[in-house]
């Protein structure tokens, strides 16, 4: 058995180089919610040195709120936004001799696309039009994944180690009870259950089927690095290999 571990990097958290030793895929901020050209260049350099798969992490234009504020943005504008950000990171990756592997939307853009098919189609169209060989990372079991598949893209269904789930398989909204697992043991147990049993316990106590193909480890928490080490060790002890795959 194998699983991909991904983390959102280039966001100014100061632990990117160390995290890259523990993950298999990196989602690099493209300057619209965090980071800038210099951080993109440096993060790509570190990722290439570690052999980590590199992905673009496009967002709404929202540096003030770290891309976590929902916007009512025209789908054509979103298409252009995402296309622009993918192109910027791709140029940096190519300049250093690498190849862009995937795209994962960030924050509010990601969460809204789970609920809004027009938004999901705009994001997916930008990815496909840029390079139809890119892998699309999206919330496991969501319509965002369905839209990407319908467009002919390869997908990785993403689960979250430290986030709470609703009974419909969506993430509990940040700022509400149960949104984040502060207890590392709870997060570790949830991750192992999702990977091995392909299910997750929702906040109402029900079990929800879930397809875990890549696990997101948030890189911006106070204990992100220590948790990443623990989850890697726990997966290894269970005989689960960590690789990006195709």
UniProtKB/Swiss-Prot annotation:
Gene3D superfamilies: Glycoside hydrolase/deacetylase. The keyword Nucleotide-binding applies. Disulfide bonds: none annotated. One of its GO terms (molecular function) is 5-oxoprolinase (ATP-hydrolyzing) activity. The keyword DNA damage does not apply. InterPro entries: Glyco_hydro/deAcase_b/a-brl, LamB/YcsF/PxpA-like. It comes from the Bacteria. Keywords: ATP-binding, Hydrolase, Nucleotide-binding. Its EC number is 3.5.2.9. One of its GO terms (biological process) is carbohydrate metabolic process. It catalyses: 5-oxo-L-proline + ATP + 2 H2O = L-glutamate + ADP + phosphate + H(+). Catalyzes the cleavage of 5-oxoproline to form L-glutamate coupled to the hydrolysis of ATP to ADP and inorganic phosphate. HAMAP family: PxpA. Forms a complex composed of PxpA, PxpB and PxpC. PANTHER family: 5-OXOPROLINASE SUBUNIT A (PTHR30292:SF0), UNCHARACTERIZED PROTEIN YBGL-RELATED (PTHR30292). NCBIfam families: PRK05406.1-1, PRK05406.1-3, PRK05406.1-4, PRK05406.1-5. Belongs to the LamB/PxpA family. This is 5-oxoprolinase subunit A. It comes from Cupriavidus taiwanensis (strain DSM 17343 / BCRC 17206 / CCUG 44338 / CIP 107171 / LMG 19424 / R1).
